[in-house]
């Protein structure tokens, strides 16, 4: 396995819509493993392919068991709230909970920043797994939040797009300053 280079905002690639994956080859599975290793190395709980420079509809997620939720979501029977790793190829959310909850989010592509984002507390997602099998996952809590966050990336959106224009613009400006500071340090 190999570590992949992380794309940091501002970068136009992060605002592109990712393309569907035609099929799962052994080469694609190596890429999935590399994504997961990169996510772990960077301390994340989710990663989208576009964040490592590949415009394909792929995300990996691994939410630690027992990760605290910052509010009291409904307990959805039959839904998973943590666990993994999950490999989502061509994921599609087919159902959103009507219950919206706030929680602080961060992003590997916007380092050193966290903002409160309001999202549905549960989703049902259809996807292909690591073996190319079609699956359906009912997720709530941090798992649902992470899936939604990563799927925003596949649609060319960053989580800060859920903020007011003022907060969004400040977050992007701060990201540019952080990226510049990190590149000067290298």
UniProtKB/Swiss-Prot annotation:
GO terms for molecular function: metal ion binding; peptide deformylase activity. Binds 1 Fe(2+) ion. InterPro entries: Peptide_deformylase, Peptide_deformylase_sf. Keywords: Hydrolase, Iron, Metal-binding, Protein biosynthesis. The active site is at 150. Fe cation binds at residues 107, 149, 153. One of its GO terms (biological process) is translation. The keyword Metal-binding applies. It catalyses: N-terminal N-formyl-L-methionyl-[peptide] + H2O = N-terminal L-methionyl-[peptide] + formate. Removes the formyl group from the N-terminal Met of newly synthesized proteins. Requires at least a dipeptide for an efficient rate of reaction. N-terminal L-methionine is a prerequisite for activity but the enzyme has broad specificity at other positions. Belongs to the polypeptide deformylase family. HAMAP family: Pep_deformylase. This is Peptide deformylase.
């Amino acid at each position: 396995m190999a570590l992949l280079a992380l794309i940091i905002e501002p970068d136009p690639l992060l605002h592109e819509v990712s393309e569907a994956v035609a099929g799962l080859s052994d080469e694609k599975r190596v890429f999935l493993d590399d994504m997961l290793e990169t996510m772990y190395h960077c301390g994340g709980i989710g990663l989208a392919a576009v964040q490592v420079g590949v415009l394909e509809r792929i995300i990996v997620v691994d939410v630690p068991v027992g990760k605290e939720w910052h509010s009291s979501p409904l307990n959805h029977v039959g839904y998973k709230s943590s666990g993994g790793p999950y490999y989502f190829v061509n994921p599609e959310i087919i159902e959103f909970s009507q219950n919206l909850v706030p929680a602080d989010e961060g992003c590997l592509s916007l380092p050193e920043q966290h903002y409160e984002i309001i999202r549905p507390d549960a989703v049902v997602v259809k996807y292909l797994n690591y073996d190319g099998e079609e699956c359906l996952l009912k997720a709530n809590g941090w798992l649902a939040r992470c899936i939604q966050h990563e799927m925003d990336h596949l649609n060319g959106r960053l989580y800060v797009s859920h903020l007011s224009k003022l907060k969004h613009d400040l977050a992007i400006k701060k990201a540019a300053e952080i990226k510049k500071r990190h590149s000067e340090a290298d």
